[in-house]
Amino acid sequence: MDLSELEDFFADRFATSEAVSSQHSHDESWHVPENLPDAVVFPETSNEVSRIISFASENNIPVIPFGTGTALEGHVHAVNGGITIDSRNMNKVIQVNMEDMDCRVQAGVTREELNSFLRDTGLFFPVDPGANASIGGMCSTGASGTNTVKYGTIREQVIGLEVIM
């Protein structure tokens, strides 16, 4: 599998080492990974994610999203190898709208980062699955937690998503 185009573009945000691939081959579930991803890429923008997805689509390469690796579902396993997209560098709170009590964030923002950012506004993000999961990861798993009875799951907290396919 020739991934040199991505390696050239992403440079130090592109990894193929066994150590990095191994870190991205599992989550907190009981599932044992049988394969490693062929590469792990760390995009910073939606356009970069789109570039990775386009490359993978053109070359028939599986893509695996990776937030913080705290999920219990086993969905981050690279069953057929492929490219793991780690969203940790997509960690910006883009906008907070006090009047509407909503905000826009990138997928890699964690719940603790968001609540730290919101602390002085009087707002908070109520979904608490126990782990310091990323917002993107929580959306992908339908996260819930200790505040679900009062505030609902992630499903009730999300107004919209930008999805790149």
Where in this protein do the model-derived segments appear?
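N-terminal beta-alpha lobe that positions the nucleotide/phosphoryl donor
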Residues: 74-75, 84, 122
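N-terminal glycine-rich flavin-associated loop
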Residues: 6, 31-63, 87-129, 143-165
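N-terminal accessory segments
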Residues: 1-31, 58-62
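Short glycine-biased active-site loop of nucleotidyltransferases that positions the nucleotide triphosphate
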Residues: 29-32, 74-79, 152
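Beta-strand-loop-alpha "switch" segments that mediate conformational coupling across diverse proteins
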Residues: 137
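Short basic, glycine-rich beta-strand/loop surfaces that mediate nucleic-acid
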Residues: 80-87
